[in-house]
Structures are given as structure tokens and as C-alpha cells.
From Swiss-Prot:
One of its GO terms (molecular function) is ion channel inhibitor activity. Residues 1-29 form the LCN-type CS-alpha/beta domain. It comes from the Eukaryota. Expressed by the venom gland. Belongs to the long (4 C-C) scorpion toxin superfamily. Sodium channel inhibitor family. Beta subfamily. The keyword Secreted applies. Binds voltage-independently to sodium channels (Nav) and shifts the voltage of activation toward more negative potentials. This toxin is active against mammals and also affects neuromuscular preparations of frog. GO terms for cellular component: extracellular region. This is Toxin TdII-3. It is found in: Secreted.
């Protein structure tokens, strides 16, 4: 399932398909 995780730096790390596996997609809020 797709989703996103907001880091402490305020950036969104999204597009994870499996635990610990993230695509290279970052968006700073």
C-alpha cells in the first residue's frame, strides 16, 4: 500500500511499498 511518512525535518518521504523500502520521493512542506 502507498503512503507517506513525515520526517522530523518536515519533509514527506513517500511511496513506500514495503517496510523500510522507500522510493526516491521527497517533498518539503
Amino acid at each position: 500500500k502507498d503512503g507517506y511518512l513525515v520526517g522530523t525535518d518536515g519533509c514527506k518521504y513517500g511511496c513506500f511499498t514495503r517496510p523500510g523500502h522507500f522510493c526516491a520521493n521527497e517533498e518539503c512542506l
